[in-house]
């Protein structure tokens, strides 16, 4: 087995019919953690339902259905391997809450794979003003992604046309450049997620494709397939030396064990014996044990999805959206208010002070009021255009002061990136995205459990 491969997380984005499920399903199917027996069961079931031809997407549909029913499915099913990496697919899209998940979840992703349908009319629909392709790519950039792979899918439906491919590459390079990506650092790969061309093996149908190349500070890399492009992702730097921040996804009550909060370590490390604080709940207690995938860990590191057992804390005291931190090392606090730079993506009217939509920031989902519009700025240059604007509308970018309607814990993006970016949701869509510049924190005395008091004396 040798040394374990580095883990990387990818998110797959693109228009609804671009073939994301088929492409992702194909990778998971061919290089993934699904055992042969499960695959055979899937195939049999798909055939019985007359979905024989649909097996890759079907794999994903099965997994997704289980995930949505709340069955904690074996996360190995969402993994596949490249020569260098263990890859986890963070979100298989097509999910209603995909954009919300992107904001709350992609703090996790190291790279975005943008799937584009090459078919006539399909590409145009995806990239049109209201197509999802642009919105997803803009979100990815705003959320701090700098690594992008573009796969131009369904090349079989274009009769493997080089002209069509070149036309799409030119158009996509243009719009991702406008957003802020450097197209030179982005590999473009023509694929058929369905037939498997250029997925794992070089296609014989596109002899004209001489391969992708990407240039980054680390040097230039080339390859032929999507798998190679994923293998060429720059290895992520995990922020384990920062103080602990762990937003809770759920809190379980487990018989014989007690209260078990679950979440992903975003920064720092968590280990047994640590005295942790939950904000904004203001509860302090000792961590009894930390585990991942039912195995005890000596410490949870950034990127790990862990469950940890805490003493003398009831399930009613803490909840999803709370943030766990080390009580002795820059503990997290409740946020009274914060200033943020927001980009208005799509709002039918005008937004003025007093607007109070729901914010999704890490795992918190709380209404926040735009209490003051401080200044309007040019989205591309970041320069100030106007002080105290009366309103902002779609396409504008502004610095605003926000006040949460209920206790909430957020951080400045520069200190803790995953806790410093958010989506503004209203009318079932993402109205704006934002990055937090500064936070006004609340100091409040909270509940310190007996276990914490005892552990602190040690």
From Swiss-Prot:
Pfam families with a match to the protein in the record? GTP-eEF1A_C, GTP_EFTU, GTP_EFTU_D2
UniProt-annotated stretches for the region G4: 153-156
Domain (tr-type G) spans 5-240
Modification N6-methyllysine occurs at: 3, 30, 316, 390
Query: Per the record, which residues fall in region G3?
Result: 91-94
Region of interest called G5, as start-end residue ranges on this chain: 192-194
| Assigned protein family | Belongs to the TRAFAC class translation factor GTPase superfamily. Classic translation factor GTPase family. EF-Tu/EF-1A subfamily.
Protein name (record): Elongation factor 1-alpha
Query: Could you tell me which species this protein originates from?
Result: Mucor circinelloides f. lusitanicus (Mucor racemosus var. lusitanicus)
Lineage, highest ranks first: Eukaryota, Fungi, Fungi incertae sedis, Mucoromycota, Mucoromycotina
- Gene behind the chain: TEF-1
């Amino acid at each position: 087995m040798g040394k374990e491969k580095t883990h990387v997380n990818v998110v797959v984005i693109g228009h609804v019919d671009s073939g994301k499920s088929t492409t992702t399903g194909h990778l998971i199917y061919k290089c993934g953690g699904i055992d042969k027996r499960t695959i055979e069961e899937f195939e049999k079931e798909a055939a019985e339902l007359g979905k024989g031809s649909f097996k890759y997407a079907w794999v994903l549909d099965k997994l997704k259905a289980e995930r949505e029913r709340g069955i904690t499915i074996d996360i190995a099913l969402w993994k596949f391997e490249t020569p260098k990496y263990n890859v986890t697919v963070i979100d298989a899209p097509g999910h209603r809450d995909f954009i919300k998940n992107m904001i709350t979840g992609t703090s996790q992703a190291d790279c975005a794979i943008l799937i584009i349908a090459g078919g006539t009319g399909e590409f145009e629909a995806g990239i049109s003003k209201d197509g999802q392709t642009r919105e997803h790519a803009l979100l990815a950039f705003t959320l701090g992604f700098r690594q992008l792979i573009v796969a131009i899918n369904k090349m079989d439906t274009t009769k493997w046309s080089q002209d069509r491919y070149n036309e799409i590459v030119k158009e996509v390079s243009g719009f991702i450049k406008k957003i802020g990506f450097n197209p030179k650092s982005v590999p473009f790969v023509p694929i058929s997620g369905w037939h498997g061309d250029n997925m794992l093996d070089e296609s014989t149908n596109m002899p004209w494709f001489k391969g992708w190349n990407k240039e980054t500070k680390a040097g230039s890399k080339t390859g032929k397939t999507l798998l190679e492009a994923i293998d060429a992702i720059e290895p992520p730097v995990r922020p384990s030396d920062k103080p602990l921040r762990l937003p809770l996804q759920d809190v379980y009550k487990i018989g014989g064990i007690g209260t078990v909060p679950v979440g992903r370590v975003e920064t720092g490390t968590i280990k047994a014996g640590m005295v942790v604080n939950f904000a904004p709940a203001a509860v302090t207690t000792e961590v009894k044990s930390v585990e991942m995938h039912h195995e005890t860990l000596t410490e949870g590191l950034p990127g790990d999805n862990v469950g940890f057992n805490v003493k003398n804390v009831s399930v009613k005291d803490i909840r999803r959206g709370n943030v766990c931190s080390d009580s002795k090392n820059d503990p997290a606090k409740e946020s009274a208010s914060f200033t943020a730079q927001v980009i208005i993506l799509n709002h039918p009217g005008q937004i003025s002070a007093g607007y109070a939509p729901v914010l999704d920031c890490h795992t918190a989902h709380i209404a926040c009021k735009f209490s003051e519009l401080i200044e309007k700025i040019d989205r591309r240059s970041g320069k100030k255009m106007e002080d105290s604007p009366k309103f902002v509308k779609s396409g504008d970018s502004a610095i605003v002061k926000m006040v949460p309607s209920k206790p909430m814990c957020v951080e400045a993006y520069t200190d803790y990136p995953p806790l410093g970016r958010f989506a503004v949701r209203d009318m079932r869509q993402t109205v704006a995205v934002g990055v937090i510049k500064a936070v006004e924190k609340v100091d409040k005395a909270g509940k310190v459990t007996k276990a914490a008091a005892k552990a602190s004396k040690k």
